Amino acid sequence: LGQDPYHEPGQAMGLAFSVPAGVPLPPSLRNIFRELEDDTGVQPPRSGDLTAWAERGVLLLNPVLTVEGGKANSHADWGWQAVTDAILAALSALPQPIACVLWGAHAQKKAPLLQSGAPRLLLRAPHPSPLSSYRGFFGSRPFSQINAFLTAHGEPPIDWAL
């Protein structure tokens, strides 16, 4: 769970933190890939397209789904959070184990929506942006924690390689 889409033209593609192939990696995504490598040993991909993770069952969701070009969080009051809160509540009602990564204060406010139902893993860390990555994002090891949780509950681990 992130915050809102990338706000530069050509970056946002409907998946939190993902950018289309060929688009330079935003700093937050570079930091995610650095943590992925440090945590799991998976080599950082050249492309920032995270579609393969989505196809493997990873929901890459921003609570706010649109943004004005060049203005981060500019659509925070447009009502998107009612929609995405309903999505999170529906996920929480599912019977299977679910692991959630809440990156940044905006995402962490959504934790109460995710705590009911079957076993849940709620990982909280600072946002991967360069402004906060050294305050606990680096070293948070979310990828290995997710896989340990899933396998402990009889679910297959996620292949994080892209």
Model-derived features with residue positions:
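A polyanion-binding, active-site-adjacent surface
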Residues: 1-124, 128-133, 139-161
